[in-house]
Amino acid sequence: RNKEKNKNEFTCEKPQHILAEIFYAFANALSGQRNYKLSNFYINLSKYLNPNFLSYNALLAENLVMLKKYDQARKIYEKLFDAGSFYKWHSSKEVALILEVQDKKKESIKFLSKAYKNIDVNLYRTFDLANFLRGHEKYEESIKLYSEILSKINEDHTLYPKVLDRRGTAYERIGN
């Protein structure tokens, strides 16, 4: 299990860390404008100024996916596995989507299912996996996960109606 905290180093006492954050803000804005190459330039400046702030890599990988540089993006996402449980799950989902784009559907499902077994599981991550499996026509597996979630939450939980609806849809798809 991946129980360590997310690993990012930042201190306001270091001017280079502050400058790195400013460049990252530029990179984020440029990415939002679909200027991925220039965004990557600013991300790389940020990484140079603060190489111990691993979160910069998430935007870099997202930009590379948008530029259809899937293998480079995957390598970055795999490095993010070590940045903490949040990034491990986020990166695993993104790698699964990359595999899907590369017409590796079975490998995608297997990859995300395996990653799920090696993270700190919570309701939302279970819901993510159940949705992913349902979207890939793995209805029985998704029903098990939806049922597991329902057994752990009350009817007034925000996830309850969504889980109930999606489980019902999965049942409909298999004819039950």
What does each model-identified segment do?
Residues 51, 85-86, 120, 154, ...:
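Short coil turns that delineate tetratricopeptide repeat
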Residues 56, 90-91, 125, 159, ...:
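TPR alpha-solenoid repeat register
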Residues 7-22, 154-158:
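TPR-adjacent "capping" and linker segments in tetratricopeptide-repeat scaffold/adaptor proteins
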